[in-house]
């Protein structure tokens, strides 16, 4: 949330989505494509994740990332990474090497140091651009989190989310992006979702799984959207926080929804039509077959 559409971001998202479609048509898995998308988003430096991540109050960048495969429900979340500029580099390498769901900080990065992914004893500093964003956002809900939800040719789904957090963070703060059921979730029987917004609200109301179940359980796509809108409004009413989501449910298809002013999202429709917006007023897109990348 909060990321505006610009010519640079539009060109980047268009190019990245077209590459993702190529991988889909070649039979790549939903999980691997979600990894590719979020890795590109991290490395672009355009968003509050990876190279563009902002600092916490002590000037240290701590990055969180999470992924889940709907086929086998395997999830991995890494949090408070300080020596890994692109958390996806570490997550992809660790994913098949551990049965754990959550790994944090120095212990997670110790493996990355041994395999030359993370830099020992060196903090990853924020870019000047990221610091300027942080200064503007002091005391406001987080924005610029990146994520992808994918349904592949076999019908499997996956979700990946990565973030640098939000402005005005106490050192050590952990948000929703590394927590399954909150900032991301994927289940072949339901669908896949990636969240953005104020992590404290997303965590306390388990927004990821709640929205996905509401969308999948509705009778039709229009009802599904209305159900999700009510849940987001409940989040704002009960916690004063806002959030946004990209999701695809197996029954009712894709949805882009947000309460904040902006949420930059790119979608690749049939016949290579690309739809990129930073505002998604209440229209249903459930009849459009597309790949979603946030």
Report each predicted region and the residues it spans.
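Alpha/propeptide regions of enzymes that mature by internal proteolysis
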Residues: 1-294
